[in-house]
């Protein structure tokens, strides 16, 4: 919704082709928003710490720039972008700055009270930050379907509204894309917030960050793998200079761990939640990681198999249109109503003779 709001503001300011300037690591939802709202997204490279390169972001700004984006943290590596530095660009060039805190929003606000103050501010205390998003269904522990967008000034919020005054059915006004919204989700979200309360969120944050810091310090000492950047919250991304990291995914998956496979560069990440703060869970995770890495390092150049190989192949495919087409075919299959009958293929068509 922030993208829609800033597009309308850009139109008002005479920009005909609004652009979103975002880090390479910013969520794909910004690509989705650009596609939906007829905007162009400019992706900015990262530095060695997996933070957005501020100089590169400065060079990416043009007269068509409608908004800047930072993440707190970004999804792939759990790293927070240098928001105060980017905010200076926002102020200098009078461009709105959106902070995507969808993943960590309900952690970062409680970090200081939990005894883990952040290295830099991220919110409206930073001059230039005009909006922040935070998903209540993640570390807010509310049901899926609820999220929050905050604006530094209500003048920005008005741009996300849609109003049709001449419809025969009457005046139609909607604050979001969804025309009708279920009250049950909002009520369940409110109930979750009331159940945990500030003290509950502070305690949850304390346990999660404590566990994450412990895991990070231990993982950094395992030969054969490394941690990307300086993750301050709950996501740790791993890479390797010695072997195909997707082999580690295969072995950990076989041990019951659900890690996310990442690309460009090849990596894995692990998102720590309250479940992982339970007794001996972190210890078991480290034990399994060490055993898996030791096994791989006996033959580091061995070929990757299974799902790891498939993901690696998808990343290496030069024709990204082919990858997109295969993804669309998969999504299409989820909505298929075709049934398999004798003598037919999966899509219902006759088998060739």
Each model region followed by its residue ranges:
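Conserved PLP-anchoring active-site segment centered on the Schiff-base-forming lysine
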Residues: 9-28
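Short acidic, glycine/serine/threonine-rich loops at helix termini
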Residues: 1-4, 30-36, 79-82, 107-114, ...
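Non-catalytic terminal extensions of PLP-dependent enzymes
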Residues: 202-205, 212, 221-222, 238-353
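Active-site pre-lysine segment of PLP-dependent enzymes
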Residues: 54-56, 80-92, 104-131
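Active-site C-terminal subdomain of aminotransferase-like
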Residues: 110-234, 238-243
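Active-site phosphate-binding strand-loop segment of PLP-dependent enzymes
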Residues: 52-101
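Hydrophobic beta-strand scaffold residues
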Residues: 41, 97-98, 227, 259
């Amino acid at each position: 919704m922030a993208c829609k709001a800033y597009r309308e503001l850009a139109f008002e300011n005479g920009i005909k082709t609004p652009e979103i300037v975002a880090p390479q690591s910013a969520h794909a939802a910004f690509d989705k928003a650009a596609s939906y709202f007829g905007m162009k997204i400019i992706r900015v490279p990262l530095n060695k710490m997996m933070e957005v390169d501020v100089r590169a972001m400065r060079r990416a700004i043009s007269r068509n720039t409608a908004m800047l984006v930072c993440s707190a943290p970004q999804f792939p590596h759990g790293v927070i972008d240098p928001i105060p530095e980017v905010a200076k660009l926002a102020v200098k060039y009078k461009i709105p700055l959106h902070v995507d805190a969808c993943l960590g929003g309900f952690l970062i606000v409680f970090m200081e009270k939990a005894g883990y103050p952040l290295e830099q501010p991220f919110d409206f205390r930073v001059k230039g930050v005009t909006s922040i998003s935070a998903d209540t269904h993640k570390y807010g522990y509310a049901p899926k379907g609820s999220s929050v967008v905050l604006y530094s000034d209500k003048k920005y919020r008005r741009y996300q509204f849609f109003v049709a005054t001449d419809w025969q059915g009457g005046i139609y006004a909607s604050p979001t894309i969804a025309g009708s919204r279920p009250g049950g989700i909002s009520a369940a979200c409110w109930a979750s917030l009331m159940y945990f309360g500030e003290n509950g969120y502070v305690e949850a944050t304390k346990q999660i960050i404590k566990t994450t810091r412990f895991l990070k310090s231990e993982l950094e000492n395992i030969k054969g793998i490394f941690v990307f950047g300086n993750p301050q919250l709950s996501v740790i991304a791993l890479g390797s200079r010695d072997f195909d990291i997707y082999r580690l995914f295969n072995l950990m998956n076989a041990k019951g761990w659900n890690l996310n496979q990442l690309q460009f560069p090849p990596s894995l990440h692990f998102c720590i939640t309250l479940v992982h703060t339970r007794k001996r869970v972190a210890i078991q995770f480290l034990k399994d990681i060490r055993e898996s890495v030791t096994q791989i390092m006996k033959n580091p150049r061995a070929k990757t198999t299974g799902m790891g190989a498939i993901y690696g192949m998808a990343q290496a495919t030069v024709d990204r249109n082919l990858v997109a087409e295969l993804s669309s075919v998969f999504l299409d299959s989820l909505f298929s109503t075709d049934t398999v009958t004798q003598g037919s293929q999966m899509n219902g068509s006759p088998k060739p003779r």
